Amino acid sequence: MDLTQIQNPSFLKDMSISELEELSEDIRKFLIEELSQTGGHIAPNLGVVELTIALHTLFDSPKDKFLWDVGHQSYVHKILTGRAKEFRTLRQYKGLCGFPKRCESEHDVWETGHSSTSLSAAMGMALARDLKKTDEYVIPIIGDGALTGGMALEALNHIGHEKTDMIVILNDNEMSIAPNVGALHNVLGRLRTAGKYQWVKDELEYILKKIPAVGGKVAATAEKIKDSLKYLLVSGVFFEELGFTYLGPVDGHDYEKLFETLQYAKKTKGPVLVHVITKKGKGYKPAESDVIGTWHGTGPYKIESGDFVKPKEVAPAWSAVVSETVRKLARVDERIVAITPAMPVGSKLEKFHQEFPNRMIDVGIAEQHATTMAAGMATQGMKPFLAIYSTFLQRAYDQVVHDICRQNLNVFIGIDRSGLVGADGETHQGVFDIAFLRHLPNIVLMMPKDENEGQHLVYTAMQYEDGPIALRYPRGNGLGVPMDDEFKVIPIGTWETLREGTQAAIVTFGTTIPMAMEAAERLGKAGVSVKVVNARFIKPMDEAYLHDLLGKNIPILTIEEACLIGGFGSGVMEFAAEHGYHSALIERMGIPDYFIEHGSVTKLLEEIGLTTDAVVDRIHTMIPSKQKRA
């Protein structure tokens, strides 16, 4: 079948099961081929082909609302709703988004990217439906990994209490990105082998009612003691106790079983949870056999061999530099522990776990819990290293404020994927952390210019015992600089001069330092002498350095790959105003006040005007022509 000709999912209703099975194979072949060129979330989507087709066959999108938790498993949904022809632009600048996007299609009713939000949003939609007295189905699809998130459990509690009509699809593939952890995961494991409780209960009730004269009374009594029946028939009754009708487990790759179960769910009043067992990566051997999460999301790959197509890497990944330094320090300090919220692979903590299995804690998709747990460990003299993506640290903001900073606890936060991350787009760009951390009392915030300085700042963080300290580091690889054999402490709040200059100064840090250095070099050749400052401590700033710099009364340009509002440049301006430098000429370059979409980092930097050319032009506008040398 030519998938690019699909306009909407209505054609599915006229297809036989054998035709749907052929369609499943066509979609898998399409995904494997297309994603081999663009990269993307291949394994999650291969696992939900039959489930997605079954949902679109039995329900009527967009009237009926599908909410894809996290959203990376929505590719099949996109194909069935007329977007197959756009897949060669997947996750590229101005191309097809890798997550549901309301502006892309009327079938995308809820945008996602972070986990565990679908149930709360679905509850909102269901309540709105009931108030408006309409009759659409609301169907959140949530994975067993996302179900470990506290927000999902809060929503389950509320939905079950209100007895709201809703069909929750639990897509259980035993993995989020890496293998799942936690007691709830174990409950689901027991349910996978428990059989179909609901049908057994209904069949028993039907048989009892057939008994002459007393059958109805016996059936009523049986209903009253259904809790006992549940415990006899099912080894885990978690969802039933929350007020849901539990259906399953059902094979998520068997159309007959899916249709039977979903039809039953459609007829059931109140909240229903359909437990669907799927195989992540199904149909492509390299992805299907992956047990650690390598094939969750990938770049381009060779279909035949399963080898990834990567540029030759001459420098280590930033995540590896940080985690390897922590691992080395853990060998000499038994107080060091590493904590991750379900990202051991992305944060490069596999080697740490192999060497220190009892000192590496994966809490699952539970950023709030991870953060406060780290605080609790710090109260007992441990040295927790919390490795967390910038975009996911947003989810634990109150815990950083209330539990870590307020108590001034020695927690080292590794803020991975800081800055622009590219293809994952708006929901994953790490551009807000400076603004939401800089104003917090007690915290130290750093970002290195290269991986050698990075290892020294990790060492500095582990030696620091005066409160919380955080290190930002970007996605991707370092610069390939030589690495010192010995670690050293970099004094807190100190900056360094990377290039001397007398006519203007560029103050920046991290990923924008190469841009600043190149701009200063070009300006120098044009007769403009520009100082470049490595502001590696975003907080506290180097006040002595700033006093000296502001005292020279030369134009200052701050650059940051982070949002301007509340950012580092704002801090420099605040310092100048508070200390009476009212004539100082300070301008800022950074991320403007809108969400940055998906695309390559290079293309996104061009869009927002954060390039070497733009820096050169800005410095020229800041320096009066009469001050420039010929």
From Swiss-Prot:
Binds 1 Mg(2+) ion per subunit. Keywords: Isoprene biosynthesis, Magnesium, Metal-binding, Thiamine biosynthesis, Thiamine pyrophosphate, Transferase. Homodimer. The keyword Oxidoreductase does not apply. This is 1-deoxy-D-xylulose-5-phosphate synthase. Its EC number is 2.2.1.7. Belongs to the transketolase family. DXPS subfamily. The keyword Transferase applies. Catalyzes the acyloin condensation reaction between C atoms 2 and 3 of pyruvate and glyceraldehyde 3-phosphate to yield 1-deoxy-D-xylulose-5-phosphate (DXP). NCBIfam families: dxs (TIGR00204), PRK05444.2-2 (NF003933). It is an enzyme of class 2 (transferase). It comes from the Bacteria. One of its GO terms (molecular function) is thiamine pyrophosphate binding. It catalyses: D-glyceraldehyde 3-phosphate + pyruvate + H(+) = 1-deoxy-D-xylulose 5-phosphate + CO2. It comes from Bacillus cytotoxicus (strain DSM 22905 / CIP 110041 / 391-98 / NVH 391-98). One of its GO terms (cellular component) is cytosol. CDD domains: TPP_DXS (cd02007), TPP_PYR_DXS_TK_like (cd07033).
